[in-house]
């Protein structure tokens, strides 16, 4: 990576920009990935280059070109993945993120994947709220295999290193082509910071499948984070 003034460049195996902003805003990846990562709208890392430029305090833009197959498969013959993003900060704490990406197929009969995303959120020292909408056309390079959905989340910081969080996801597929995996999900929980490097987060989850006759699923987790 390299930075100079308002310009930043990254190359090699890098974090992609498709949903990195949303993931950071959500802030609980070790508990549950952000919407696009959770439902495989894209990869969190890939081989390529990215550039970002801050035009003013309230607006910045970024572009990325990567291998398109994620960090587990390195190739160029099957097409590349291109992305453009704009981040707006109209007022302190309130941010808007717009992103569009095109992932080439490189194979006859396969369609390019198009990703469109819009996010807005407000972050305060006491609380965070955010909402995003995502649309993916031609999932897995299959024509008309479109998916879309939204995610809404909020968290509140309490005294003594305790925070509460909640999130609702809703995933759809065009003409119900992927109805077996379409679902709405709710997660509620708390996070306890035990010192500087340890976090423990008990949480309750409810998954509500959209396929007829499939019952909702209820589960409880305790997620742990250890980091330096």
Set out the residue ranges of the language-model regions.
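Outer-membrane beta-barrel "beta-signal"
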Residues: 88, 192, 216-228
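Transmembrane beta-strands of outer-membrane beta-barrel pores
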Residues: 4, 13-17, 65-69, 100-106, ...
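Outer membrane beta-barrel
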Residues: 1-68, 78-83, 87-96, 153-156, ...
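Outer-membrane beta-barrel porins/channels
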Residues: 67-68, 111-112, 126, 192, ...
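Outer membrane beta-barrel transmembrane domains
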Residues: 151-157, 161-201, 205
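Outer-membrane beta-barrel domain signature
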Residues: 36-42, 70-75, 104-111, 139-143, ...
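Residues that define the transmembrane beta-barrel architecture of outer-membrane proteins
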Residues: 43-47, 78-82, 112-116, 146-150, ...
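Detector for outer-membrane/organellar transmembrane beta-barrel domains
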Residues: 77, 85-175
